[in-house]
Regions:
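Conserved phosphate-binding loops in N-terminal lobes of ATP-dependent enzymes
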Residues: 3-75, 107
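Adenine-nucleotide phosphate-binding core of ATP-dependent small-molecule kinases
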Residues: 34, 38-64, 192-254, 272-284
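Glycine-rich phosphate-binding loop and adjoining helix at the ATP-binding site
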Residues: 35-46, 65-69, 75-136, 252-267
C-alpha cells in the first residue's frame, strides 16, 4: 500500500500520513495553538517552505520511503507555481513544487511533490471519503476566502470564488481587488471589511432579529452563492455540490434553494443537489495525498 503525506495550508499548516486513502496517526499542526490564525501571514516564503517540510518529516515518523507528497494551498496554482494567493500574498510567484522538492531532498525524502489548490484538495478528499474517485465532485469552501474545488483534476483556472455575481460598482471587498466577486460578498475577511463595527457572526444574528441592514446583507450573501452555483451548473451541468468551511453555519438552505430555483430554469439542468458537510481538516489532508498519488501515477 502506498504511503503518502498530505499537507494543507490555510490559517494553519496541517499534515498527516495517508495509507490506502485513510489517515494514520492523526494530524500534525503548526502552530500548535488552534486560535493563532495570523502566524502564517507573518512568515516569509522560505520559512513557510521549511515549516511544511518539517511537518512532513514528523508525520513520516522516520520512514522516508514515501510514495508522494501533496501540498494544498489557497490560491491559483499551475505547474507547481503559485501564480496568485490573495490570502497569503507572500506566496505569489513562488515556485512551490521546486522549493519543497529541494528542501525535502535535503531531509532525505525524494518522493514526487504535487502542489494544488486547497479547494481541489478538499474535493478529492470528499471523493475518497465517499468512495467515488470515478465521479465528478464539486465543493464550495466558505472561509476566510471562498474556494471552488473540483475533482477529478481538469486543466484550468477554476477560481470560482472570484465569479462575478453582481455589477454593483460599490462591491469592491474581494482580496484580489476585483469588483463584484463572490468572495467580496461571502468571504470572512470581506464581511469584516464591510461591517467594520460588527463581526460576521453578529451580522447574521442581527439578521435573525430583523435588523434591516443585516437581513438585506444575508439575502445578498445567499444570492451570491446561488448565482455562482447556478453559473457552474450552466457551464458544466448539474450534479451534487458540497458546502463546507467554518462559515457554512450561516447558510439558510430554504433561502438558498429559493434563489437557485429562480436562477436555474432549464429542466435538464434542475437535477442538482446541495449538501452541507462538516468542515474536516482530515478530509483536506487525505485529498492532498490522494491528488499527489494520482499525479504520480500511483
Amino acid at each position: 500500500m502506498a504511503r503518502s503525506v498530505g499537507v494543507t495550508l490555510s490559517e494553519h499548516v496541517l499534515a498527516g500520513l495517508v495509507v490506502d486513502h485513510k489517515l494514520v496517526n492523526g494530524l500534525q499542526r503548526f502552530p500548535k495553538d488552534e486560535n493563532d490564525r495570523e502566524a502564517l501571514i507573518d512568515m516569509h516564503t522560505e520559512a513557510l517552505v521549511e515549516t511544511i517540510c518539517d511537518e512532513v518529516l514528523q508525520v513520516a515518523n522516520g520512514n522516508k520511503a514515501l510514495a508522494s507528497v501533496g501540498v494544498a494551498v489557497p490560491g491559483l496554482v499551475r505547474n507547481g507555481v503559485i501564480e496568485e494567493a490573495p490570502n497569503l500574498p507572500q506566496l505569489k510567484g513562488a515556485r512551490m513544487r521546486e522549493l519543497l522538492s529541494g528542501q525535502l531532498k535535503q531531509r532525505g525524502i525524494s518522493a514526487p511533490v504535487t502542489v494544488l489548490n486547497d479547494a481541489d484538495g478538499y474535493a478529492a478528499g470528499m471523493a475518497a471519503k465517499l468512495g467515488k474517485l470515478d465521479a465528478l465532485v464539486r465543493v464550495w469552501t466558505l472561509g476566510v476566502g471562498i474556494g471552488y474545488g473540483r475533482y477529478p483534476f481538469t486543466p484550468g483556472v477554476w477560481e470560482g470564488g472570484h465569479s462575478v455575481v453582481t455589477l454593483d460598482d460599490k462591491e469592491r471587498f474581494c482580496g484580489c481587488g476585483g469588483r463584484g466577486h463572490m468572495e467580496g460578498i461571502m468571504g470572512h475577511r470581506a464581511m469584516r471589511l464591510r461591517f467594520l463595527d460588527m463581526e460576521p457572526e453578529e451580522v447574521f444574528e442581527a439578521a435573525k432579529r430583523g435588523d434591516t441592514r443585516c437581513f438585506q446583507f444575508k439575502r445578498l450573501w445567499h444570492k451570491a452563492l446561488a448565482a455562482a452555483t447556478a453559473s457552474a451548473i450552466h457551464m458544466a451541468g448539474p450534479g451534487k455540490f458540497f458546502l463546507t468551511g467554518f462559515n457554512v453555519r450561516f447558510v439558510d438552505m430554504p433561502m438558498l434553494r429559493d434563489y437557485m430555483q429562480q436562477m436555474v430554469k432549464m429542466s435538464p439542468l434542475q437535477s442538482y443537489s446541495i449538501e452541507i458537510v462538516e468542515e474536516s481538516p482530515e478530509t483536506r489532508v487525505i485529498g492532498s495525498a490522494v491528488s499527489a498519488e494520482q499525479a504520480a501515477g500511483i
